[in-house]
Amino acid sequence: ARPAAPLPPAAGLNINFKVVITEFADNVESSGGETVARLMSDKEGLSIAYFDEPFSKTFLNLESRTLFDLIDKGQTILDRTGADILVWGYRETDRIRLNFQTEKQYEKEDCSFVSLMDSLYIPAELTDRRLDFPAALNNLIYGALISSINVFSKEAKIQKKYLLKKVIDKLSRDNSAKTLSIEYMPYVMNFLGIIYLSYAHDNGDEKDFKIVKNLFDTAIKHQDLIKNPIHLGCIYYHLGQLYDSATQYMPRRPAAYFRGAIENYRQA
């Protein structure tokens, strides 16, 4: 095992990123959003709020004709609450799909690697029965939240890197891929890839590159479990981002990384 790298010097910054979790779009009586908010409320570096104002959430089906309604409504809530991240939840049969929205997600440069279309699925049974989540799933959701944060100041970037390092240390001890049944595999591996990419994209380390690539490749190997082609496109897009980052921070083989970026962006 590789020795743990020292944590970035962020512990004294005392920066909390604000997360707003909406009540989930659900056709059964449950409190999914409230459950996730409760489970994330004690996480370091996050300030959690629960948003349960009633409004139609039909746009959460991710159909292209309603996508702009989703973006606009989310931006309105972000503006009202001053949140760094908005978490949506939507029931699909026996699963809950989580999506993560940030301010001006498709307008600003240097945003996080997380797309609004990136979907993390969790068993609906956990929220229906208000159960505590397995520790590995808890850590995965926490890592997804930290990865989603857009950071523009030096202090915020240091804090994000510090929190990512701590959650990766936890995830490396979890067996996240086996926490949920096989049907969740591509979504778990995609978010593990995003979390590691968010931390390591500017490290210039060949080993980190291979770790992240392997996570996304594993997600793609299980593409037969992906029902919506949008989700597969997200994975290829992140592979493109990985190669794109390598062209900037790993100067040994820029042409090869550049080709990899183009191929994966095209596939997405």
Predicted region positions:
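TPR-adjacent "capping" and linker segments in tetratricopeptide-repeat scaffold/adaptor proteins
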Residues: P8-L13, M117-Y162, K170-F191, I226
